[in-house]
């Protein structure tokens, strides 16, 4: 399977700062494809939402760097999925705790895509979306 990746965010026309973050990581193994991608959309009505977006994407990066050497030799796809889901829940809790402890309005939506071999898995926190683009575009 050929995989092409690209990542970009933009602050848009109305914001002074970009509260969005995006990461995409791909294993360098030719045999066992592993891709983790995550886009976080900061909540514009919260002044410091870029903090939440950065916490989430940095957490996905740490997770990928830690897991990539274990798949598939030590962990099968099911174990990787379970570990990723736990990580997303923990990152969401981390953002919530940061907000409560500091009394700071931060928050973001998050959509993540995990690809292992020929299968893909989608994770959401909030209302962001992921699309599959072939001859046409379809929300997944």
What residues fall within each predicted segment?
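PP2C/PPM-type serine/threonine phosphatase catalytic domain
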Residues: 1-140
